[in-house]
Structures are given as structure tokens and as C-alpha cells.
Amino acid sequence: MKVTAVSGTTATLQTAQTWANNDWVFREDSRGNEIMGVQGIVDVTTFVTTLHGISRSTYPEFGGQILDNSGTNRPVTLDLLQQGFLQAEQNGEGEISLGVCTYNLWRKIGNLMAPDRRYTPSMTLAGGFTALDFNSKPIVADRDGPANNFWWLDESSFTRYELADWDFDDTDGSVLHKVSGEAAYEALLYYYAEMACTDPANSVNIRDLSET
């Protein structure tokens, strides 16, 4: 399957495909090889039942804090954000340091804060990025974040393990490799690493939030 064009909401394929609702699309050969993300780490058994070799069915305390609405989207509210914030700190004994959501939810949360803007200024992070200020913690937007989700994260419980840093494959003596049957060359950039979490219960995933 080859993608020939992409817009903000539509991907055009070279040939027609039959997909069903809730099907997933992956970059070729990447499924199962990507770094574990927060959707799998801050989970119970919906997406990842065994994390870092630990079964969450056997050890439920290795699951994240989940606030959902049984699959029915509801509006994001400041009270709901506060509920998730406190649940992570009370039930998981975490120290929340960061909120993450989609751009649509980030915009909606900003609008909810607008009446109190002079009391809740935005925050400027390293690199010049701007974040919303909630309980003196930054909320940032992630362009790759799954829709209808918000995360409160205890960053101190996350770590990244690296086997090899970013590098080009040159095992045959060359970085560029001829593409069979085409007047083209390609290169392979690799990075062997994994995201890990020592205590997923310190973070919370608020699910089923309306993006519209």
C-alpha cells in the first residue's frame, strides 16, 4: 500500500483498500518495532496486558490510573482534569509534572482557562515551547497524540534505555543502497531503544474526551 498524498484529514492511496472502523494503519514494517508509548504504559489491560515482561493481570498494581466514560466521549472540564491530577497523586503516590493531550483538547482547555487568564499565565519551556499552566504544571500538545485522550504524567518514573544511538546502517561499507528495479537509492537510519516506566500507577490517562 502506497500513500500518494496527505492532507490534514485525508490520506490518498495509490490503490483502493478495504478498511473497517477502528482499523490501524502503520508505516511499513514498523508495527511492533516502535518505542512503547504512554498509551501502552499508562494502561491496565486495554492496549498492553504485559508491560516490560510483567503481567498486569497478575500484578494489577503495575497498571496506570484510568478515568474513562465507558467509550462515550464527554466534554473536557477543569474539574475532570483536577480529578485525574489528584487520583494520580493520591492512588498512585505520584508527583505529576506534565500534562499531554492533542491540539484540539489543548485549545479547549485553554479556552476553559481564558476567564482566569490573568491568574493562570502560560508557561515557557526549554526551547521556547509554550504550555498551559494547571496547578503550576505544564500542559503541552502532542501532534501525534491519540484523539480523545489526556495524560497526567509523573516524568520521574519514566526512563529511556538505549542499546544504540541514532546511526545509518553501513554494514556493507556504504550508507546508500540501490533500490531494486528503480533509479533510486535509499538509506536505513536506525535507533535501538525502549521507553520504560518504573511505576505506571503514578500517572493517569483520562479517556473518552470529545475533540469537537
Regions found by a protein language model. Give the residues of each.
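Core alpha/beta structural scaffold of self-assembling particle/tube/pore-forming proteins
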Residues: 1-212
